[in-house]
Swiss-Prot record:
It is an enzyme of class 3 (hydrolase). The keyword Hydrolase applies. It comes from Petrotoga mobilis (strain DSM 10674 / SJ95). This is Acylphosphatase. The lineage of its organism: Bacteria, Thermotogati, Thermotogota, Thermotogae, Petrotogales. Belongs to the acylphosphatase family. It holds the Pfam family Acylphosphatase. Its EC number is 3.6.1.7. It comes from the Bacteria. The keyword rRNA-binding does not apply. It catalyses: an acyl phosphate + H2O = a carboxylate + phosphate + H(+). Keywords: Hydrolase. InterPro entries: Acylphosphatase, Acylphosphatase-like_dom, Acylphosphatase-like_dom_sf, Acylphosphatase_CS.
């Protein structure tokens, strides 16, 4: 099991990205969350089987057709009890 945290920069708020990533996170049976940050970026924390977390990373990089990534920061993150993949407000 692995846990990753990504901070997404660019046109990432107000374009349906959180909902898009939640749907994929649930389908991949991941735990974690996605949320908007005050600086206009989006934070994603995903925990699960390594292959499934890497698949979510691929989905993040592809975007939803409305988002436009300018930068992505990635780091290992502590394993936690995040529950099902959800949107945090």
């Amino acid at each position: 099991m692995v846990c990753k945290r990504w901070i997404l920069y660019g046109r990432v708020q107000g374009v349906g990205l959180r909902h898009f990533l939640r749907v994929h996170g649930v389908r991949l049976q991941l735990e974690g969350y996605v949320r908007n940050l005050p600086d206009g970026s989006v934070e994603v924390v995903a925990q699960g089987e390594k292959e499934k977390v890497l698949k979510l990373k691929t989905i993040i990089l592809q975007g939803n057709g409305f988002s436009r990534l300018e930068d992505v920061q990635e780091e290992d993150f502590p394993i936690g009890n995040y529950g099902s993949f959800h949107i945090e407000y």
